[in-house]
Regions:
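C-terminal auxiliary extensions adjacent to catalytic cores
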Residues: 312-379
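A short, Lys/Arg-enriched amphipathic alpha-helix followed by its capping loop at the start of a domain
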Residues: 19-28, 62
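Beta1/beta-strand and adjacent pyrophosphate-binding region of the FAD-binding site
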Residues: 2-15
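Active-site-proximal substrate-binding core of FAD-dependent oxidoreductases
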Residues: 261, 277-317
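FAD/FMN-dependent oxidoreductases across multiple families
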Residues: 75-76, 203-289
């Protein structure tokens, strides 16, 4: 193989492994460096969602299009499968014409998304070096997906066993999830409960206890073998996409995250796909992202600003509006995609929001570091 056919990837998360799978399918010899000893070790077997409202295509079709097989738990949940509760614990049920989201598991269990992607990559001959941290690369192309670096939003929760039937419940109330939401996801006797916060992180324990009380108020649930977990998401005003179209940043490391509600896994996997496509077809990665990802990311920041200024009366109003619709998918799709009004709000939002990331820079004159973003070609 020529030197151009060897690709280095840093990070075995969804973005890095999606890139590796697509490169291997195209005949590239790919080596992935992962500092942990396995995929998904940042997670505790907690359930998350692949949202299914922002695109015309169903999310399963998108995964198929970007070369990903479903060899992991990926269970559809429609409006009929769950409930929402507003600040006064008023029950809201929504109608959907297709699954609202696909429930997936994160972590190192065999059914997790992380292990499914690992298996797909290894079956294609991708060489994954576990417990290896790569600080710099030579002058060849590299893809870097090393995950979030700072907490722009946090989650505190637990995974547990329960006899409750499969269900999802979402709570929107600043008293239990400031500027965010709390949720319960149950699938096949396993459950994840968490509350998310976009502010007032120091009081996470108080919000968590309040959220747990809210769950016990609206549903009779048995909690067995509970294990607590914490998590965080990180995003930027402007994603840092590449250095000189040579070091390509993917996933949350690059800022590909949903600033509204943190549904960023699809963005991460798509960024890995576009990074691979740019190498396979000799295209400009930055331009691919600007066309296919940035409009939604900018809209998500505009939506974050709008949501942060709704407060509890606004949440009640929105939920009441959603429950009158015959199908909430078109409304959510419109909300998640760009428009003239969202472009105007984005101009306000990008000045209002500053990421908590302190971007440490190296002092190398001709930077080839994978972790910093300085230099004229940084983004």
């Amino acid at each position: 193989l020529s030197k151009e056919k060897y690709i280095t990837i840093v990070g075995a998360g969804p973005a890095g492994l999606t890139a590796a799978i697509n490169l291997a399918n195209a005949g590239f010899e790919t080596t992935v460096y992962e500092q942990n000893q396995n995929a998904g070790l940042r997670f505790n077997g907690d359930f998350q969602g692949l949202e299914n409202w922002s695109d015309e295509e169903d999310t399963l079709q998108i995964l198929n299009r970007i070369g990903i097989k479903i060899n992991f738990l990926c269970h559809p949940y429609s409006g009929n499968d769950g409930l929402f509760y507003g600040p006064k614990l008023e029950k809201v049920k929504v109608k959907t014409s297709r699954p609202l989201f696909y429930l997936i598991e994160r972590g190192s269990d065999p059914n997790s998304l992380d292990q499914g992607l690992r298996k797909q990559a290894e079956e294609l001959g991708v060489n994954i070096l576990w417990g290896k941290n790569l600080e710099s690369v030579d002058d060849s192309k590299a893809i870097v997906g090393t995950g979030p670096k700072a907490a722009d939003a946090i989650a505190k929760g637990m995974v547990f066993r329960t006899s409750l039937d499969d269900i999802f419940i979402g709570f929107i109330d600043d008293k239990i999830a400031p500027k965010a939401y709390a949720y319960l996801l149950v699938n096949d006797g396993k459950a994840t409960f968490a509350t998310c916060m976009f502010e007032d992180f120091q009081n996470e324990k108080i919000y968590y206890e309040r959220a747990l009380r809210a769950v016990n108020t609206v549903i009779d649930i048995d909690i067995n073998e509970p294990e607590e977990f914490g998590g965080f998401v990180n995003f930027f005003n402007e994603p840092k996409i590449s250095k000189d179209n040579r070091i390509l940043y993917v996933g949350e490391n690059a800022g590909f995250q949903d600033a509204l509600w943190g549904f960023g896994i699809k963005y991460a996997m798509l960024s890995g796909y576009y990074a691979a496509e740019s190498i396979i077809h000799n295209q400009n990665y930055k331009k691919l992202c600007e066309i296919n990802l940035l409009p939604k990311l900018k809209t998500s920041l505009a939506n974050r600003w709008l949501f942060a200024h709704l407060y509890n009366p606004g949440y009640t109003f929105i939920l009441n509006k959603l429950k009158t619709m015959d199908d909430v998918i078109p409304a959510l799709k419109k909300h998640y995609n760009t428009s003239m009004s969202k472009k105007l709000v984005y101009q306000i939002a990008k000045h209002w929001y500053k990421t908590r990331l302190i971007d440490k820079q190296c002092m190398h004159e001709n930077c080839d570091c994978v972790w910093c973003r300085h230099g004229k070609h940084a983004h």
